[in-house]
């Protein structure tokens, strides 16, 4: 409840001057053909399809981790993200855990990490605040000694490592798995980013050795020249950020590796193990199925990584008997012996890994969403609530699409780099903040999640940011030209800026933000409603498009409509892990046996906690339904909406002040009906249409429970009803009507009139029973759906008979007059003029 000046808001008719709506139809659906890949990929990759096979195997293989359990997929297993709920906390900037800790189990009540008394007001009382981050657990802290080879030269899945005491990630002296200081970005659609990681430190120009691209001029691989000699070879591949990104985590002492492991070590290990030897692979896997070991015969693939590499890569990068030492020096020819001698294939493993994983991830494109159907011309692909949320998303009132632009809904993608958008053209752009103007890298924005000094984000990339390269005169190292219309002056605004992520499949990829601070999409919408958490403290750092959104403030139905739109960005193939999102089995460490106060020992090294393992079963091309497995769930499996809002003495106990709000088209007008559950002085009815929230506003007396609106508005309109009592704003409710592009489009019917004779009688029950049990035609399914639950079942004819003969309840609206269906569902009417 909030105090308001009723007289300032009571206007019979108000047309708002708003910026023009940005229509989503300004671009088309996402096309697989637009997937960016390096132009010179064929100089290294011999067979793209074989490279995809190799990349998928490497991405999912747990043997890549020094612990024999941590794969790339471990942090990207669920819709491309990491939704584990135990041992995921990192202390963040302060270096000390405050509310959470090692092995803590996350619950919905832990979020958001900055809790305010009013989630729509950034300056309201702070209930709690923490620098903590929800990251991804990697491996325990340990030094790498060597890979562990047996006498036959086969590698153990667990490396020879020595545990290191870890005062940060431990409980009573027992080490727990370390956790990253940022939340894991989701992998699906990541091929489209210009630079990768939250700060973009994985560069678009791949150097074959590390993530830094042109930032490492000494990066070299080895190659066989035309004369058969082994020579150093620089690698330069544009549009290859995923190759740069993929070679970071495997050597990270937090994520996957013992400290000190090198790429030739990992190459030797993987060339000495059976691919996916610890994991079942479905015989119907869309990529690996033909190589999968038959059920009952073991696990893994029937081939070797050596064979897979030879089929995928050009021979000049592996076909040699040269032997190299730990430092990459050519020390002879023949067969490498022991863990410290390496073949050319093993010496070039960073190149092989990076390109193979990039090729695999380039196939993970989710372009079969209902949003894509809408963009392709299907106006009914979205529900009315989703369409209204989309209109708000693309409106000048919220400014969401300024940064979340294009078919990927991200300004950090190749398709948006040189596109004229409201956040600039080209890699280096003018950046307006809430205080002054400056410059920064396009697609990276400070949105006020935390104080800028806690994590400087893009600025941490140093002299390799695009802005720094531009000022250093290294314009040839930019991913595109700087546009002459951009004013590049003032302060550097890369401080605290992070990559704008795609919003596709976002309902599955929580927790949200670079620090994992929001658990639900509603919390994200409320974050933007209040204009970020620290905009008022760091106005000179936070982008000008992040500021309070008044029309969303205390208007939960509008916020929920935006959440509904975001859910329409989910590709059902991702939800059900259908091709190309199928995968091998994966054993997932989800914290340790015990609590945040005490853990059981039992890790690989002494003084390490015993892992609590979750088994993700292997899935084939047909997805989870093939193995009778439920769909992928979001983080904590938390509903995106808010719980029921008890509003105290003014709200009638636990009931909302108004309930059962419905709206429908009746004759040439829109009718709203609702129930009032408490004393109400007045109502404000707002009409949202075309992306303008409150295009018209009306005052209604508190003793009314109905409202009529006589203006036709095309497409979808939201009707927001906000009750007031003694100057206090209570919880609002909303309903939606989609009237089409022209008047008279909606079908009108009388609820319960199954046979369309204009009245309710026993014939309606008989006709409905025949339809349910014999398949007889039901001319208007909506009319037959007595309780408007979106389904036809035996309860509907029973309710008809109960109403006719036993004084049972009347049907849902529309009744007793003909009108349109108040609720959007999958039922339909085969006749358009039923009531005429």
Give the residues covered by each predicted segment:
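Bacterial N-terminal signal peptides
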Residues: 8-17
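Cellulosome-associated attachment modules in secreted, modular CAZymes
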Residues: 19, 652-654, 735, 739-836
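Periplasmic c-type cytochrome electron-transfer domains
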Residues: 20-654
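Pro/Thr/Ser/Gly-rich low-complexity, intrinsically disordered linker/stalk tracts
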Residues: 652-679, 728-746
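Extracellular low-complexity, O-glycosylation-prone stalks/linkers
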Residues: 679-697
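Short beta-strand segments within Ig-like beta-sandwich modules, predominantly Fibronectin type-III
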Residues: 697-703
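Short strand-edge motifs at loop-to-beta-strand transitions and within beta-strands
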Residues: 705-707
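Beta-strand-rich modules
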Residues: 709-729
């Amino acid at each position: 409840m909030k105090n308001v000046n009723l007289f300032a808001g009571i206007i019979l008719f108000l047309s708002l001057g708003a910026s023009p709506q940005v229509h989503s139809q300004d671009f088309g659906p996402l096309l697989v053909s637009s997937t960016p890949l390096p132009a010179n990929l064929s100089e290294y990759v011999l067979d793209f399809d074989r490279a995809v096979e190799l990349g998928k195997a490497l991405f999912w293989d747990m043997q890549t981790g020094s612990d024999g359990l941590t794969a790339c997929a471990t942090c990207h297993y669920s819709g491309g993200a990491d939704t584990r709920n135990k041992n995921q906390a990192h202390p963040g900037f302060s270096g000390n855990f405050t509310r959470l800790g090692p092995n803590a189990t996350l619950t919905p009540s832990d979020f958001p990490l900055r809790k305010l008394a009013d989630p729509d007001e950034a300056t309201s009382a702070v209930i709690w605040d923490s620098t903590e981050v929800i990251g991804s657990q990697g491996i325990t802290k340990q030094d790498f000694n060597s890979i562990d080879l047996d006498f036959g030269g086969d590698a153990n899945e667990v490396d020879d490592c020595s545990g290191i005491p870890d005062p940060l990630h431990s409980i009573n002296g027992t080490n727990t798995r370390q956790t990253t200081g940022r939340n894991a970005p989701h992998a699906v659609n990541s091929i489209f980013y210009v630079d990768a990681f939250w700060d973009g430190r994985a560069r678009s120009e791949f150097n074959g050795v590390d993530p830094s691209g042109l930032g490492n001029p000494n990066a070299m691989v080895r190659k066989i020249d035309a004369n058969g000699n082994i020579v150093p070879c620089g690698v330069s591949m544009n549009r290859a950020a995923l190759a740069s990104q993929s070679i970071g985590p495997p050597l990270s002492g937090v994520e996957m590796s013992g400290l000190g492991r090198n790429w030739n070590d990992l190459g030797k290990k993987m060339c000495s193990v059976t691919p996916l030897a610890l994991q079942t692979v479905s015989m119907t896997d869309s990529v690996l199925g033909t190589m999968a070991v038959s059920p009952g015969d073991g696990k893994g693939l029937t081939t070797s990584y050596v064979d897979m590499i030879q089929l995928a890569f050009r021979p000049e990068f592996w076909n040699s008997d040269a032997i190299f030492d730990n430092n990459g020096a050519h020390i002879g020819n023949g067969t490498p012996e022991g863990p410290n001698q390496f073949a050319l294939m093993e010496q070039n493993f960073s190149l092989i890994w990076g390109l193979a994983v990039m090729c695999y991830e380039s196939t993970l494109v989710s372009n079969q969403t209902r949003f894509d159907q809408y963009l392709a011309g299907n106006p009914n692909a979205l529900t009315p609530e989703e369409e209204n949320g989309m209109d708000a998303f693309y409106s000048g009132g919220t400014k969401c699409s300024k940064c979340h632009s294009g078919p990927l809904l991200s300004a950090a993608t190749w398709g948006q780099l040189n596109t004229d958008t409201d956040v600039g053209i080209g890699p280096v752009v003018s950046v307006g903040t809430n205080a002054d103007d400056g410059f920064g890298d396009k697609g990276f924005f400070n949105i006020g999640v935390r104080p800028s000094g806690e994590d400087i984000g893009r600025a941490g990339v140093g002299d390799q940011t695009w802005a720094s390269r531009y000022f250093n005169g290294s314009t040839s190292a930019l991913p595109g030209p700087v546009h002459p219309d951009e004013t590049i002056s003032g302060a550097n605004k890369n401080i605290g800026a992070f990559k704008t992520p795609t919003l596709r499949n976002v309902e599955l990829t929580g927790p949200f933000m670079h620090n994992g601070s929001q658990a639900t999409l509603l919390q994200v919408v409320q974050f933007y409603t209040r204009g970020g958490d620290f905009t008022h403290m760091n106005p000179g750092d936070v982008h000008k498009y992040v500021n309070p959104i008044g029309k969303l403030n205390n208007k939960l139905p509008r916020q929920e409509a935006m959440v509904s739109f975001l859910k329409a960005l989910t590709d059902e193939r991702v939800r059900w892990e259908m091709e190309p999102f199928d995968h091998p089995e994966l054993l997932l460490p989800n914290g340790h046996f015990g609590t945040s106060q005490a853990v059981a020992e039992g890790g690989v090294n002494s003084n390490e906690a015993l892992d609590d393992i979750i088994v993700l079963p292997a899935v084939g091309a047909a997805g989870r339904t093939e193995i009778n497995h439920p769909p992928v769930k979001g983080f904590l499996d938390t509903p995106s909406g808010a719980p029921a809002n008890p509003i105290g003495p003014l709200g009638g106990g636990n009931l909302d002040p108004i309930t059962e709000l419905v709206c429908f088209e009746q004759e040439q007008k829109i009718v709203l009906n609702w129930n009032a559950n408490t004393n109400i002085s007045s109502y404000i009815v707002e009409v949202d249409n075309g992306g303008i929230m409150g295009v018209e506003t009306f005052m209604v007396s508190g003793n009314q429970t109905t409202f009529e609106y006589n203006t036709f508005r095309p497409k979808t309109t939201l009707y927001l009803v906000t009750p007031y009592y003694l100057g206090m704003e209570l919880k609002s409710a909303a309903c939606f009507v989609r009237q089409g592009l022209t008047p008279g489009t909606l079908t009108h019917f009388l609820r319960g009139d199954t046979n369309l004779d204009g009245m309710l009688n026993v014939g309606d029950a008989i006709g409905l029973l025949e339809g349910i049990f014999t398949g007889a035609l039901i001319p208007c399914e909506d009319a037959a759906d007595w309780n408007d639950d979106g389904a036809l079942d035996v309860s509907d004819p029973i309710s008809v008979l109960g109403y006719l003969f036993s004084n049972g309840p009347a049907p849902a609206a529309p009744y007793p007059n003909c009108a349109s269906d108040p609720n959007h569902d999958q039922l339909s009417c085969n006749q358009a003029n039923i009531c005429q």
